[in-house]
Amino acid sequence: MEIIQTTEAFKALVQDIKTSINGYKEPLAFGVCRVDMGQLNLEKTLQATYPVINWNENFGSAAIFIKALQEQGVEIDFTQSEVICNINKAFLKSCLNAFSPYSEEAYGDAHKNIQVISALYNQIATSGSKDGEFKVTFIFADEPLKSVEATYLKLYALSQAKVEIRSINLNGAFGALPNVAWSNGKPLELDYLREFEIELKLANEYPHIEFVDKFPRFLQHIIPADNTRILDTSKVRFGAQLAAGTTVMPGASYVNFNAGTTGAVMVEGRISSSAVVGAGSDIGGGASILGVLSGTDGNPITIGKNTLLGANSTCGIPLGDGCIIDGGLAVFAGTKFHINDAELIELKKVNPNTKFDNYMKGWELAGLHGLHFRQNSLNGQYVVQRSTREIKLNTDLH
């Protein structure tokens, strides 16, 4: 592409690209990434790092990327759910020519895609690059995942809150991602470590392996909000979503991918895959929220606002606002609870559309507000009462 002089000419170019390319389709998501390739299998992508991702936005930049690829002889198949293409210095130069009207404005939070293209062009011009080290990824449909690059793009979208938890298709992610050893943020093929174990150890070059997993850690890719605290990097998996003000303590805490918080939450327990916790809630030490793969029959759990899960409790049903599960208590869908007549009256006040009985199972109480799950210490009976206290976090800590 030639150098574009004005914003009007840029807009005209974008429109021409969209109308002239056969079957053109705007991507759901796209971004430029650097990939880590295998140490033995040089064609195998182990990790994709995106400085900027776009989700249902910045379609003009996408059009320029697609046109620049076309100029390099790359034809995009818009019928595919995901497309990954290698990019080079010529691609970057063509994009910069098209972005010229906006180049002086591309700093801070403005025109992030132009900043990426400019920085990468300068980096390659100075230091060069390996073949296939940099790629552009397009997702055209929210379908099961096929590649590492597209999987990482969706995980970024979750962790950067571009999309809501549980709102995108992550089927295929486990199959697409390789199981690798991680050392200082770098993925290493296990086969490579096995094959060169002797040489690496004799040369005192065997890497310090921090963990082995398909997913990296959240903080390897995401910069959290200023008032978010994560006291142990191993406690949050990449693909988790943490709202501003969330605190993840060390010890028994854990937040899985496609799970997280929608407001300031104290996390000292486990938030399993697809579980969502509302603002002001407290997940006590060792408490567990079951995930779709761990006992909920595939039904994801949402915890409402200002709810307390006591230490070492287990929650297997969705909860509304202002609920309490006492420490050590396990609440499952099939667990039967007693509610006395006086408590029934109080519970109906905050759940007016619910039909209550003296004995109800956990699934019948799912999503209701103001529930206090307890166990009678005299007879062992599980009971539900109206929660009489509002759960509030210490604002100084969040």
From Swiss-Prot:
<dbReference type="GO" id="GO:0008666">
    <property type="term" value="F:2,3,4,5-tetrahydropyridine-2,6-dicarboxylate N-succinyltransferase activity"/>
</dbReference>
<comment type="function">
    <text>Catalyzes the conversion of the cyclic tetrahydrodipicolinate (THDP) into the acyclic N-succinyl-L-2-amino-6-oxopimelate using succinyl-CoA.</text>
</comment>
<dbReference type="InterPro" id="IPR032784">
    <property type="entry name" value="THDPS_M"/>
</dbReference>
<keyword id="KW-0028">Amino-acid biosynthesis</keyword>
<feature type="binding site">
    <location>
        <position position="311"/>
    </location>
    <ligand>
        <name>succinyl-CoA</name>
    </ligand>
</feature>
<feature type="active site" description="Acyl-anhydride intermediate">
    <location>
        <position position="268"/>
    </location>
</feature>
<comment type="pathway">
    <text>Amino-acid biosynthesis; L-lysine biosynthesis via DAP pathway; LL-2,6-diaminopimelate from (S)-tetrahydrodipicolinate (succinylase route): step 1/3.</text>
</comment>
<dbReference type="Pfam" id="PF14790">
    <property type="entry name" value="THDPS_N"/>
</dbReference>
<keyword id="KW-0808">Transferase</keyword>
<comment type="subunit">
    <text>Homotrimer.</text>
</comment>
<protein>
    <recommendedName>
        <fullName>2,3,4,5-tetrahydropyridine-2,6-dicarboxylate N-succinyltransferase</fullName>
        <ecNumber>2.3.1.117</ecNumber>
    </recommendedName>
</protein>
<feature type="binding site">
    <location>
        <begin position="374"/>
        <end position="377"/>
    </location>
    <ligand>
        <name>succinyl-CoA</name>
    </ligand>
</feature>
<comment type="similarity">
    <text>Belongs to the type 2 tetrahydrodipicolinate N-succinyltransferase family.</text>
</comment>
<dbReference type="Pfam" id="PF14602">
    <property type="entry name" value="Hexapep_2"/>
</dbReference>
<feature type="binding site">
    <location>
        <position position="361"/>
    </location>
    <ligand>
        <name>succinyl-CoA</name>
    </ligand>
</feature>
<feature type="binding site">
    <location>
        <position position="288"/>
    </location>
    <ligand>
        <name>succinyl-CoA</name>
    </ligand>
</feature>
<feature type="binding site">
    <location>
        <position position="270"/>
    </location>
    <ligand>
        <name>succinyl-CoA</name>
    </ligand>
</feature>
<dbReference type="InterPro" id="IPR011004">
    <property type="entry name" value="Trimer_LpxA-like_sf"/>
</dbReference>
<dbReference type="Pfam" id="PF14789">
    <property type="entry name" value="THDPS_M"/>
</dbReference>
<keyword id="KW-0012">Acyltransferase</keyword>
<keyword id="KW-0457">Lysine biosynthesis</keyword>
<feature type="binding site">
    <location>
        <position position="334"/>
    </location>
    <ligand>
        <name>succinyl-CoA</name>
    </ligand>
</feature>
<feature type="binding site">
    <location>
        <begin position="326"/>
        <end position="327"/>
    </location>
    <ligand>
        <name>succinyl-CoA</name>
    </ligand>
</feature>
<dbReference type="GO" id="GO:0005737">
    <property type="term" value="C:cytoplasm"/>
</dbReference>
<dbReference type="InterPro" id="IPR001451">
    <property type="entry name" value="Hexapep"/>
</dbReference>
<keyword id="KW-0220">Diaminopimelate biosynthesis</keyword>
<dbReference type="InterPro" id="IPR038361">
    <property type="entry name" value="THDPS_M_sf"/>
</dbReference>
<dbReference type="GO" id="GO:0009089">
    <property type="term" value="P:lysine biosynthetic process via diaminopimelate"/>
</dbReference>
<feature type="binding site">
    <location>
        <position position="285"/>
    </location>
    <ligand>
        <name>succinyl-CoA</name>
    </ligand>
</feature>
<keyword id="KW-0963">Cytoplasm</keyword>
<dbReference type="InterPro" id="IPR026586">
    <property type="entry name" value="Type2_DapD"/>
</dbReference>
<dbReference type="GO" id="GO:0019877">
    <property type="term" value="P:diaminopimelate biosynthetic process"/>
</dbReference>
